[in-house]
From Swiss-Prot:
Mn(2+) binds at D445, F446, D584. It comes from Arthrobacter sp. (strain P1). The exact function of MaoXI is not known. It catalyses: a primary methyl amine + O2 + H2O = an aldehyde + H2O2 + NH4(+). Belongs to the copper/topaquinone oxidase family. Its cofactor is Cu cation; Zn(2+); L-topaquinone; Mn(2+). This is Primary amine oxidase.
């Protein structure tokens, strides 16, 4: 079968990398339900675009629209992968996954778990013994169970942490029910275990941030309006964006959220490729507390929860300011119904202070140019935390990836007056929040002036001949194989890494390059023999470089949910020790936040910035922003006022 003209119009596909539309998702589900997934027991984990091969895209050949689907058959308690040809109407591949593989959770499975816990007789009775009888105020928060050496016998499990509210709008995180965990089997559809250990008094002090609890808002801050009277400087055609010298395509997947494709920079009229594909690959949040419940908190928010599905519908004026372009995100619920996250991705421009300036004191003249950046973002809510993910593109060719962490701490209970060395007391009523980390990995499929790239490590070194003691230099070392490219940051050596193209030379006959500035380059704090370290080995180092393989997509492997970490992921792929010199390669950078909790993080956390920079390093022959015009501002009378020129 092929899509008819009416369906094609609904699909709205203009490029092979465009995400699947709702029509295409519905079609893929229908094809699967008419075929191998006909049974009512099947649940859909994800249906997304099967991206064409890079060779086909470069060649410009016609490619079929295909969908990758992941499903679970609850009756068999087994998982499957499928490839669907949307134009032919066929299932081209149907693969039974290994018995121990558990795909990510779906959003409606979280609601299913909470509802089942609230109705379970054993749970109700156990809570009643703790004096909690109004189940409408009890909140069950499903987490992944992780892996701690146990045999879960192929069961697809969630573990629910439990909190309680004083009233409907009260923050439940102020009132954790400690040492009380409910295990729910999604395939069996029932509670299978209850861990009800030492009861600790539920903290009663509130921790609310809603206006009705906080009181009147301050009135001394005057309006700060963002105006662009001539509109935004970007042009959008479908999912293709051009802005200043940048061009790229916007993508969205249930697993990664925002994806950037075919990132190019126009230099002297030529579109030069920089990165073929860039996205969040994985993240893990391990907790450092030894308390029984807290010690098993280590969520892989991308690989276990499909963080793209948790994207917010963004609101003008609150999440993004200025002239905004939104992109919707399409996904599927567990029953195969397409659904849309409206305004899942936000794109806008921001002023970014000065870009360059010089005052010629001899002539008494100054030249200043202001910077601006293009911001492409999405924000995901993962239970208590919010993660805002940003790609920033700058006029000088720089790129920034930034995570802004906010939301509410994951809290725990202790006896009033206790001081837990593994966390911060938030009040004197027994509430604390454990120390933890937020570890992120970003995958960047570089294509710097072409496919054949290489990576250098650059360290500061002192020469042997150094009579004044002031000499130091930057020394490049080529990373030749995957094993040699497993690296850690080193601030003492001012280390950074360069991605270069030996076949493309700049003005001084050096390979063109970009450099990765490894800010926030922390590593996993857990011991190497800890289960979370074995599962999140990507977080034990900061830099990984692999030879391109389209099947190697996620740093902790394709399916980290309940996985041991022994079979998949960067640490497995790099054992091949493939050549990474003058070849198609992928750069993976791990960074994070070591979150030592403070009182100011409660009851809602001021955002914390975590990220890194990519900067051109000999990619251009000179500063590429010399052609920027002098800037103007608008006065209160509405007249243009030149704010960046001589004599002002």
């Amino acid at each position: 079968m092929t899509l008819n003209a009416e369906s094609e119009a609904l699909v709205g596909v203009s490029h092979p990398l465009d995400p699947l539309s709702r029509v295409e998702i519905a079609r893929a589900v229908a094809i699967l339900k008419e075929g191998p997934a006909a049974a009512e027991s099947f649940r859909f984990i994800s249906v997304e675009l099967r991206e064409p091969s890079k060779d086909d895209l470069r060649a410009g050949v016609a490619v079929a629209r295909e969908a990758d689907a992941v499903l679970v058959d609850r009756a068999q308690a087994r998982s499957f992968e499928a490839v669907v040809d949307l134009e032919a109407g066929t299932v081209d591949s149907w693969k039974l996954l290994a018995e121990n593989i558990q795909p990510p959770f779906m959003l409606d499975e979280f609601a299913e778990c909470e509802d089942a816990c609230r109705k379970d007789p054993e749970v109700i009775a156990a809570l009643a013994k703790r004096g909690l009888t109004n189940l409408d105020l009890v909140c069950f928060e499903p987490w992944s169970v992780g892996y701690f050496g146990e045999d879960n016998e192929g069961r697809r499990l969630m573990r629910a942490l439990v909190f309680v509210r004083d009233e409907a709008d009260d923050s439940p995180y102020a009132h954790p029910i400690e040492n009380f965990i409910v295990f729910y089997d999604l395939n069996a559809g029932k509670v299978v275990r209850l861990e009800d250990d030492q009861a600790i008094p539920v903290p009663s002090a509130r921790g609310n941030y809603l206006p009705k609890y906080v009181g009147e808002a301050r009135t001394d801050l005057k309006p700060l309006n963002i105006t662009q009277p001539e509109g935004a400087s970007f042009t959008v055609t479908g999912n293709h964006v051009t802005w200043a010298d940048w061009s790229f395509r916007v993508g969205f997947t249930p697993r990664e959220g925002l994806v950037l494709h075919q990132l190019k920079f126009k230099d002297q009229g030529v579109d030069r490729p920089v990165i073929n594909r860039a996205s969040l690959s994985e993240m893990v949040v391990p907790y450092g507390d030894t308390a029984p419940v807290q010690a098993k908190k280590n969520a892989f928010d991308s690989g276990e929860y499909n963080i793209g599905n948790m994207a917010n519908s963004l609101t003008l004026g609150c999440d993004c300011l200025g002239e905004i372009k939104y992109f919707d995100g399409h996904s599927v619920d567990s029953h195969g119904n397409p659904w849309t996250i409206e305004n899942a991705i936000c794109m806008h421009e921001e002023d970014d202070s000065i870009l360059w300036k010089h005052f010629d004191f001899r002539e008494g003249t100054a030249e200043t140019r202001r910077s601006r950046k293009l911001v492409i973002s999405f924000i995901a809510t993962v239970a208590n935390y919010e993660y805002a993910f940003y790609w920033h593109l700058f006029l000088d060719g720089s790129i920034e990836f930034l995570v802004k962490a906010t939301g509410i701490l994951s809290t725990a209970g202790q006896l009033p007056g206790e001081k837990n060395p593994y966390g911060q007391s938030l009040n004197n009523d027994g509430l604390y929040a454990p120390i933890h980390q937020h570890m992120f990995n970003v995958r960047m499929d570089f294509e710097l002036d072409g496919v054949k790239n290489a990576v250098y490590e650059v360290d500061m070194e002192y020469p042997e001949h150094n009579p004044t003691g002031t000499a130091f230099m930057a020394v490049d070392r080529l990373l030749e194989t995957e094993q040699k490219a497993i690296r850690k940051t080193n601030e003492a050596k001012h280390r950074f890494w360069k991605i270069a193209n030996h076949e493309s030379k700049n003005l001084v006959n050096e390979p063109v390059a970009y450099r990765l500035i490894p800010t926030n380059g922390i590593q996993l704090a857990a011991r190497d023999d800890a289960y979370v370290s074995k599962r999140a080995q990507f977080a034990r180092n900061n830099l990984w470089v692999t030879a391109y393989d389209r099947t190697e997509r996620f740093a902790a492997g394709e399916y980290p949910n309940q996985a041991t970490g022994a079979d998949d992921g960067l640490h497995i792929w790099t054992q091949k020790d493939r050549n990474i010199v003058d070849t198609d390669l992928v750069v993976w950078y791990t960074f994070g936040m070591h979150h030592v909790v403070r009182l100011e993080d409660w009851p809602v956390m001021p955002r914390q910035n975590i990220g890194f920079m990519l900067e051109p390093h000999g990619f251009f022959n000179q500063n590429p922003t010399l052609n920027l015009p002098t800037s103007t501002s608008t006065t209160q009378t509405g007249e243009a006022d030149t704010c960046c020129h001589n004599g002002k």
